[in-house]
Amino acid sequence: KKYHYEGLSFLHGDIADYTGTDSADMVVTLHACDTATDYALYKAMKWHAGVILSVPCCQHEVNKQIACEPLEGALKYGLIKERLSALFTDALRADLLEENGYDTQVLEFIDMEHTPKNILLRAVRRPDAGMADGQSGLTEAEQKSGQCCKEPDSKRLAETLQIHTTLQKLLEGE
């Protein structure tokens, strides 16, 4: 009300259960814990949101799954495994956004002295992109250049780390 926005609402609940819209101009998530970020990103992609700003929180899902022989020496230390898992989770999310029609950046949005959870996934929908509705997220030029035949970065990363995230499952289930 203070800023005179019309039609803006805030809801409290589980994003996985939310069915109240077919489209959104912008989706913002702040510290959505673990797989809640995946559900929010998936819904934002389904709604063809023009802009997605997401600040993920805890990423336990990958921490429970990650297994990578070349990284065994580092992954045996709980703290390092936790931090690497969080970074790999956000890298995978960024790759999936890219593959589904978004120009994506991974940014530090606030100094580490304020909070260690300071990664922002900023995704802007490409005007000529398909999306998570069964169409390719590649532009026509990328499809013509043969990039459509290249194995997606997200798939290679997930296979290397032996992980399968909620966002991957949601996108595969379409």
Question: What is the role of each PLM region?
Answer:
Residues 2-174:
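Class I S-adenosyl-L-methionine
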